[in-house]
Regions:
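ATP-dependent adenylation/nucleotidyltransferase module used to activate substrates
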Residues: 1-183
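ATP/NTP-dependent adenylation/nucleotidyl-transfer catalytic domains that generate, transfer
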Residues: 21-25, 182-274
Length: 274
């Protein structure tokens, strides 16, 4: 193990010990991804994991890798949340109805929370988890845009002094895989083939490299086709969608202001035609 990783492990454990005691009312948002598994192992090593409620938040698009992994973890409670019940944006109802129609007409991946992940994390979870004083996450600072808007440091202080604690916030991707190898940690089987999980495939921002798209195409061709249907639809109709859902900030940020990504996709599609 490198000295750099040893120092980061010490730092992460100290963050946990300095901000949590067994008397605290705490929970852990367990995603079944590699980062969550690492935090889970750190909590276990510190002998505090059994005192923390562990939740997997169901999105309606759980792949078999995640479902199989959850079966091996009876200590993790799976919960589903009605996003429309918690979201403040009145247009989410119109958005939901519109998407159901879009699914059928364009053979697009069906997910309950499609187009609302950012709202879901900031609005839904913040309300649902309000009863806890501390929420642990596996978020890292080099995570994607929508995650970084929710957690911006290893310790995020919320209203009434509630905390979001992300012990491995400063870890790199290399740190994570070194720790996993050193501790012989079992991951979701998707990591063996793809190197990531399929659970966020519904988000065009998540897989914004042609390399990732090629992996999806190789191992899950039907899923790839439906994902590309979504991307092409959003690209072709982005101006109309902006007019229709102009006040839904999360929708605009996630899909309509990302022209640089759609240009990449357009280029990729043109190559496929040749």
């Amino acid at each position: 193990m490198t000295n750099q990783l040893e120092e980061k492990i010490k730092e992460s454990k100290q963050i946990i010990l300095d901000n949590y005691s067994k008397d605290d009312n705490a929970c852990f948002l367990f995603s079944c991804g590699k980062d969550s598994v690492i935090v889970d192992n750190l909590l276990k090593e510190l002998k505090v994991r059994d005192f923390i409620y562990q939740y997997y938040i169901a999105t309606g698009f759980e792949d078999d890798g995640i479902l199989d992994y959850l079966k091996s973890r009876p200590d993790v409670t799976t919960i589903g949340i009605d996003a429309e019940k918690y979201m403040r944006e009145h247009k989410c109802f119109a958005l939901s109805s519109y998407i159901k129609k879009l699914y059928k007409e364009n053979n697009i991946i069906n997910s309950k929370f499609l187009l609302s992940c950012c709202s879901y994390k900031r609005q839904v979870l913040s309300k649902y988890l309000n009863k806890y004083d501390i929420v642990f996450t596996g978020v890292r600072k080099d995570d994607l845009y929508n995650t970084k808007t929710w957690v911006k440091s290893a310790i995020t202080i919320k209203k009434e002094n509630k905390k979001i604690i992300s012990p491995i916030f400063n870890w790199t991707e290399e740190d994570c895989y070194e720790y996993i190898k050193e501790n012989d940690i079992k991951l979701n089987k998707d990591y063996d083939t793809l190197g990531f999980t399929r659970s966020c495939l519904i988000c065009p921002i998540q897989y914004n490299t042609t390399e990732n798209l090629e992996k999806i195409k190789q191992y899950y061709p039907k899923l790839y086709d439906r994902h590309m249907n979504l991307i092409k639809y959003l690209y072709d109709n982005r101006r109309d969608l902006q007019e229709l859902f102009g006040s839904l900030e999360e929708f605009k940020k996630a899909f309509l202001n990302k022209d640089y990504y759609y240009d990449k996709v357009k280029e990729y599609l043109e190559k496929e035609k040749k």
